[in-house]
A protein has these predicted regions:
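Beta-strand-loop-alpha-helix segment that lines the small-molecule cofactor/substrate pocket
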Residues: 57, 61-112
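Mobile, glycine-rich extracellular loop/lid and propeptide segments
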Residues: 1, 51, 56-57, 68
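Short, solvent-exposed loop/turn and secondary-structure capping segments
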Residues: 8-15, 43-44, 61-66, 85-87, ...
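A structured beta-alpha segment of the ubiquitous adenosine-cofactor-binding alpha/beta core
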Residues: 19-53
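Predominantly a Rossmann-like dinucleotide-binding segment in NAD(P)-dependent oxidoreductases
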Residues: 100-105, 110-159
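Conserved short alpha-helix immediately C-terminal to the canonical SAM/SAH-binding motif I
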Residues: 5-9, 37, 59
Length: 159
């Protein structure tokens, strides 16, 4: 594990340990702090291991590049980039990961939704004509959880 801030590193470890104490094995000597902490965290992994990049996207490409150099498979959260030059850099790094036979995945929650895939296919097949502008909005209310407390009877759902 790695972070720039001690309190965030501690909180991440605490949250992971709380939910799955038997599955979390990150002793203090494998929790790294600082701007180069990502390198220290990857240095303790072996080629073929998996690294999770859940950092702000501005830092994604140097971390991805280092993971490729170390022969690590990568799971990264979206967004992957924030601008054109960085996007081109990520495409180049993606090609390098393919050359090294590394697996790379991105946390795109809608990518595997059958209804959205069908919508994509219909748009691509021209069912709504030529597109000059497309805006999409994801409208959702509060997300439920198995761990959510029940709403008090005197509380409105429209807060």
């Amino acid at each position: 594990m790695a972070d720039v801030f001690q309190d965030k590193l501690d909180k991440s470890y605490e949250d992971l340990s709380k939910g799955n104490p038997d599955q979390v094995d990150v002793p203090a000597d494998r929790r790294f702090l600082g701007f180069d902490a990502y390198k220290k965290a990857m240095d303790v992994l072996s080629p073929g291991d998996i690294v999770v990049l859940a950092t702000p996207p501005a830092f994604r490409w140097p971390m991805f590049q280092y993971a490729i150099e170390k022969g690590l498979n990568v799971f990264m959260e979206k967004p992957v980039t924030v601008d054109g030059p960085t996007s081109r850099k990520m495409f180049e790094l993606g090609e390098k990961s393919v050359e090294k036979n590394l697996k790379v995945a991105v946390g795109l929650m809608c990518r595997h939704c059958d209804a959205r895939q069908e919508l994509h296919d219909r748009i691509k097949n021209g069912e709504i004509g030529d597109i000059t502008l497309l805006r999409a909005y994801r409208v959702a209310g509060p997300t439920g959880s198995a761990f959510a407390e029940p709403k008090p009877d005197d509380e409105s759902e429209l807060l």
